Amino acid sequence: TNAPTPETLNYLREGHIDFGIVSTPFPERPDIQMIPVREIEDVFVAGRRFFSYKNRTLDFQKLESLPLIFLEKNTSSRSYMDEFLAGNGVYVQPEFELATSDMIVQFVRRNLGVGCVMRDFARDYVESGLLFELRFNKMIPKRQFCVVRNTKMPIAPAAEKLLEIMELDAAVATV
C-alpha cells in the first residue's frame, strides 16, 4: 500500500499488512517494532520564478510571504514541517496541499510556488538545474524512514525473512 504514515500505522494495527515503511516522527507504541533504515531530509525547492532567492541565505519567516506547496495535513511529513516551523515562530498557509511529493515537484517545475519535499524527490531536477533548493540560516533536522511491524500480530514467513534481511542491512550500514 502507498499511504501516509498515520494510515499505514492503522493498517498495521488492524492486521491488514505485515509491515510498513513510514517516516518519523510518529507516536511510539509498545506493540509497534520500529527499524530505522534510511535518513531523510526535508527541503524547500523552487524554479526560475524564484531565482532571486537562489544562493541567498533566508530566514524561515520568508516562507510566510511565498506561495507554498505542501503535502496534505494527514501526513507525518506535513505535521513535522508544521511543528518545526511553528517552533521557529513561522506559520504558513500553503497555496496548494497535494497528495504526493511527486505532484509537489511537478507544481514547482511549473513555477506555481515553493515546494516542501524530501530531498530525494527533487534531486534529479536540482542536479539538472531545473530547480534549486532554498537555503536557510538554520538547518531542518533530519528524519528517518523506518520499517514498522505489529509485534502482537502473526507475520507471514516471507515477510519475516525480508524483515530479517532489512535489519541486517541496517545494522551493517551503521557500522
What is each model feature region?
Residues 132-174:
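A late-sequence structural motif
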Residues 33-43, 128-141:
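Short beta-strand->loop
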Residues 24-30, 83, 87, 102-133:
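A ligand-binding cleft/hinge motif common to bilobed small-molecule-binding domains
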Residues 31-68:
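Flexible hinge/capping segments at coil-to-helix
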Residues 52-54, 67-88, 155-159, 163, ...:
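Secondary-structure junction motif
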Residues 12-13, 63, 106-112, 147:
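Hydrophobic residues within well-ordered alpha-helices
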